[in-house]
Design a protein with these regions (language model features):
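N-terminal Rossmann-like NAD(P) cofactor-binding module of classical short-chain dehydrogenase/reductase
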Residues: 75-78
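NAD(P)+-binding Rossmann beta1-loop-alpha1 motif at the extreme N-terminus of oxidoreductases
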Residues: 1-54, 59-66, 70
């Protein structure tokens, strides 16, 4: 299991997170700009409006800050 950070919670970042979680990786989706989208994704069902699907429950959603980069990630993706 790898720890993966995806920076950008738009359609591309969110869609990329799904197969990673299905393959038992720990994925954190972080959004630096669109706080309105971040708030929607943080709700219980994690519905993504562009993809029109509920994101996996195991997906961690977090507001981006420079502190997040100090964690030990196996992979960082900018989407």
């Amino acid at each position: 299991m790898k720890k993966i950070l995806i920076i950008g919670s738009g359609a591309m970042g969110a869609a990329f997170s799904i197969p990673l979680i299905e393959n038992n990786h720990k994925v954190t989706l972080s959004e630096p700009y669109n706080l309105k989208l971040l708030k929607k994704l943080s709700l219980k069902k994690k519905f993504h409006p562009a993809l029109k699907i509920n994101l996996p429950k195991k997906l961690v959603i977090q507001k981006f800050s420079s502190d997040i980069l100090s964690f030990k990630w196996d992979l960082i993706v900018i989407a």
